[in-house]
Structure formats: structure tokens, C-alpha cells
Amino acid sequence: MLPLVALVGRPNVGKSTLFNALTLTRDALVHDQPGVTRDRHYGVCRIDGQPLFAVVDTGGMVGKEDGLAGATARQARLAAAEADVVLFVVNVREGASALDDDILAWLRKLSQPTLLVINKIDGVSDTTVHSEFAHYGFSDVVPVSAAHRQGLDDLIEQVLAWLPERSIGEALNEDSERIHIAFVGRPNVGKSTLVNRLLGEERMIVSDVPGTTRDSITVDLERDEFRYRLVDTAGLRRKSKVEEAVEKFSAFKTLQAIEQCQVAVLLLDAGEGVTDQDATVLAAILDAGKALVVAMNKWDGLATYQREQAEDLLSRKLGFVNWAEVVRLSAKHGSGLRELFRAIHRAHVSALRQFSTSEVNKALEIAYQTAPPPSIRGYVSKLRYVHPAGSNPPTFIVHGTRLKVLPDTYKRYLENFFRKRFKLVGTPVRFLFREGDNPYEGKKNVLSERQIQRRRRLMRHVKRK
């Protein structure tokens, strides 16, 4: 399970700015006006694409009139209760307030591990930063400027030190022989019906009412001598549509399931086509870098012309993930399930494939010779060498010079070239580009005395000519 870190504090102390800085997104609204964030929402803190922990942003707790019993405060209380670590965020420019004192007293009753994060330290003396909140008695205090990304490395390091010793890798290794599959999609597309069909029993509650599944449910399956771990998740909606507190927690559990799976099956309603909500779910899968299979459910109920329309809409809206296989099936009647498992296996094998340094360098050399990078403002990028940097998804680090001007079109060319050469199906491929990291830079072979004498003789010979 991904550990969870909650951001708690009064309004306008910079919680949403800190959330955006930790998750490298702009998901949280940021404004000088207090109270912009009312609900809680979730993101993931990653370094080089590897997830470290989930982050939940909460609304600011306001004065005693609404106080700790208000709706926004209830959201913050729920977030703090489910978190592994709480970050109590304060504003050094405004100093400690009575509301800060009230929130701290509530946090101490909660008995959750808590770090004091002093925000907006830019332009403030160190003496002021450390003295303003000294009376709170925190042993762990992290000064940051979320807006300028100052102190974030120290904050992440402190958070990791406080988190329980568990990770995605450990969760997956609980049964490394099983293929971990998450069935995800918007509400009421048939995820629970599909899992029940695969299991051959009514394990999940099935209803026409969207949102019947409120938690991620994990079950094991053995089929055709293969072992699987299936996760039926709650439907993901756009954030504006997520209202109930329980449903917000369900959305977080779904994001956790995506982070922990090896293959994500995105279930679509063939009759409704690809909707904006489907795009929201797909974005979560792509952000996590997971292998993907697209399943068009309720295919058997479509007429010929409806199927043609569905295919056309799919190619137009999901053309940017044309590397993912599409399976047409009926969860209700069981058609297409064998092809679904075949697609899952192909995606799983591709996502976890191991590469040697020699074979990826050979591929880079051929790609470079076939189509060199274009000249950008008189500069041409040089790709010197590449090495594999991980799997699920396959990741490669390319070293060279002037890589900052390498156009996105050429990066996509490399991705497609590697995908075709190594027959990678159903998995994203990531490239990281590094400049000036030549391992042999600054190193020289020390010449022996004999080599030095030989070089001198050669130089005398050259001079006589």
C-alpha cells in the first residue's frame, strides 16, 4: 500500500501550493483568498517516476464559528485520521495564531505522527523562522518555501524517515508469482460484473446504481495454470462530481490500486464510447506508468453500425495510446475473456522485460543513423549512449549533449522505434535524458615510460617530414 501524508492547517498557509510542489502538478487550486480548497483530494509524490507516498490536500480550518466541527474541518479530520503522517503547515509571515493553537491541540489528541512545516520562509531571517513557533515544542521542524520549491528535499527526506516501512515493491512481492491486475473505469461500466464472471461467483455486489463498489476488493484467481490477483476498484469520476466523503476515500483507494498493479484494465462502455470520465481514469493509469489493456464492455449489445461508430470514436480519442491492445467483450455473457487474458499476458511480459546495455545501445545507434535529430536554432543534439533504468514501465536513460533542445517529436520517434524493435505491446516506454554524465569524462590513461618514449620518437619523425 502507498503510505499517505495529509496536509493540515488554517486557511492561506500554502497547503495547496505545497501539494502542487510535492506532486509536481497543478491539481490544487491556488489563490491568495483563504478557503479556496474546500474538499480533500489526492496526488502522488514521485522521484524519477517512482512513487514514494500519496499526498492529500485539505481545506483550511476556519474560525470558531464553523470551527473544527464545520464541513471543511470534517474533511481535514478524515484525511488526518487515515494518514500515516500529518504535515501541520503554518505561515511564518503571519506568525502563530489562536487558530493554529486550536488545530495543534486537536492534532495532539489524534496522536498521529506529525511534522511542523513552516512555509513562506523566503525573505525571512533564520532567527524569525525558528523562534516564531518554538513554543509549540516540535522536535521535527522543516522550513520550506513551497512557491519557490525551497526545502522540499529536506521535507521529503523527513517524511520518508517517519513513514512505516512499506512500499509498492514490498506489496507486489507478497506473491511475486501472481500477475496483479486492477480493473478500473468510471462508475457502472461493469467492473464488478467482469470480476464476478472471471471468478464464476457473485463475489462483488452488482447493481445498476453507479458507485455500488465503494472500496477496492482484492481476490486471487488461478486460470489456465496461471495465478492472478484481481482488484475490483470503485469508479473514478471527475473531481467536481465526487461529493461524499466515503466516495473521496474510494477514489484514493482506486489510485492506490493503480499504483500497485502490474497491468491496468481500463473498462469502457461500448455503447457510450469514450467519455471525459474515461479520460480521467486513463490519465491516472498513464501517470503511474502502468501496462494497459483497453476493454470495450457490452460489445454484444451493439448493432453493426454502432460498432463502427464505437471503433471510430475509440481511434480518434485514444489514438495517443495506440500501443495498448483493445479487447471487445461482454462481462455479462463471458465472450472475449480468453482474448482479454492473452492481451494482459502480452502487456505484462512487455512491461517487465529486462534489457541488456548492449542491445539498447545497438537500437539507439540504428535509430540515430536512420533519422538523426534535427537542427534547432543551429544546434544539433548528440546521443552518445543509453542504458536501461528499470521496468514496469521499461525506462531508458540517454546520455548526450544539447539534449535540452531535443524536440518532443524526436523523443516520440525514439519511443516508437524501441517499441517496434523490441516488440513491446501494451506498456508505456519512458526515456530520461541526461547531459554531461559521461562516466569517462576527466579520466586519462596513465602512459608507461615505454609508451612515452615511443610517442617522442613518433613526434620527431613527424617533425622531420
Curated annotation (Swiss-Prot):
GO biological process, one term: ribosome biogenesis
Binding site for GTP 1: 9-16, 57-61, 119-122
Keyword flag rRNA-binding: no
Keywords: GTP-binding, Nucleotide-binding, Repeat, Ribosome biogenesis
Domain EngA-type G: 3-167, 179-352
GO molecular function: ATP hydrolysis activity; GTP binding; ribosome binding
Residues holding GTP 2: 185-192, 232-236, 297-300
Span of domain KH-like: 353-437
InterPro entries: AAA+_ATPase, G_ENGA, GTP-bd, GTPase_Der, KH_dom-like, KH_dom-like_a/b, P-loop_NTPase, Small_GTP-bd
Keyword GTP-binding attributed: yes
Superkingdom assignment: Bacteria
Pfam families named among the record's database cross-references: KH_dom-like, MMR_HSR1
CDD domains in alphabetical order: EngA1 (cd01894), EngA2 (cd01895)
Recorded family membership: Belongs to the TRAFAC class TrmE-Era-EngA-EngB-Septin-like GTPase superfamily. EngA (Der) GTPase family.
Function: GTPase that plays an essential role in the late steps of ribosome biogenesis.
HAMAP family noted in UniProt: GTPase_Der
Subunit structure: Associates with the 50S ribosomal subunit.
Name the record gives this protein: GTPase Der
Origin species: Xylella fastidiosa (strain M12)
Biological classification of the source: Bacteria, Pseudomonadati, Pseudomonadota, Gammaproteobacteria, Lysobacterales
